[in-house]
Amino acid sequence: MALHPPDEPGPYPAEVRHRIRRDMLPDYVFVARALNQCGTGVVSIQHEYGIWGGRDGDYVLDFVRELRRPTVVTLHTVLRTPTPSQRHVLVSLIEAADASVVMSRAAASLLTRAYGVDPRRLDVVPHGVPDLPLVSPDSVKPRLGLSTDPVILSFGLLGPGKGYETVIEAMPQVVEAVPNARYVVLGATHPELLRHEGEKYRRSLEECAVALGVADRVLFVDRFVGRRELGTWLEAADVFVTPYPNLDQIVSGTLSYAMGAGKAIVSTPYAYASELLADGRGRLVEPGSPSALATAFIELLHDRNVRETLGGRAYEYSRSMIWPQVGARYRQIFARVAGQVAAPTALSRRLTSVHG
């Protein structure tokens, strides 16, 4: 089943059997009834703000209430200060589902504390990551046409609010200490941003690099990359950075992937990063501070042993985040809600404590 936003082209691949037009409420009811009739075992719903139609995505409630099949909802975002409408949608969705999955202990705690959700309704399952080998970055760089110059990497859909400017502003100080260091910004511009203002934001970053005299040390890879190539870029990175200014961010797929690749990570202390990078698994720096970022980068780029120590800790921690482990946990939850096994009385820390 796919949610179809307005103005998006088709068609979908063969595995998509049903399509819901995002802003057409009758589609939600029709597809729910179709799933009831075709004997679907379990319906797995991914909830993210902005995906579902209606006010704050409340059409998803009509969909879930029409379902007569066991339902598991995965919550990708839990807002620390929701509006009354956003809170109503999320709490109602959790109450309507047979099980709800969050990807961090911080998210589970927030739902319990601020939303009044019964913790027994929540399962904590890590954000999944590919099972990448732990390799030397310099052994991988030639596959991307790179020299062995040190690489600081960010990836994801490009858009404001991710702190890329702060990293670029840190680069003059970094290059003074490590002249051959390079910052790579990997990823296409977010399609919604592209639709509304084109490449204005990307150009502003490029202009910032030029103004600071580091244009030759900042590389923009302006395209979407598939999973295999993304894995290669992660393996090639010496340092990974998530400089996000929003300290309430409850999950980050990019940070999860960097953990899975065993990277030395520098990050602002948003909720998810604080959880994953605790106990010496990374470096946390204050948000919006080019100087703090530069200091962390220089330390790591000057000391291979420190990089490898941080990366090794991140890699070990991420082993329960790899997709086979995450898939096994979801199968357990699906079986439980389908009535095939009894609900567990206790869940092991390894499988329920978030690592991604």
Model-assigned labels for residue ranges:
Residues A292, E299, V306-S320, Q332:
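A short, well-ordered alpha-helix in the C-terminal region of glycosyltransferases
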Residues D279, R283-P290, E299-N305:
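Conserved acidic donor-binding segment of nucleotide-sugar-dependent glycosyltransferases
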Residues D98, R217-R223, T232-Q249, K263:
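Acidic donor-binding loop of glycosyltransferase active sites
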Residues M259-G260, A264-S267:
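Short hydrophobic beta-strand element within catalytic cores of glycosyltransferases
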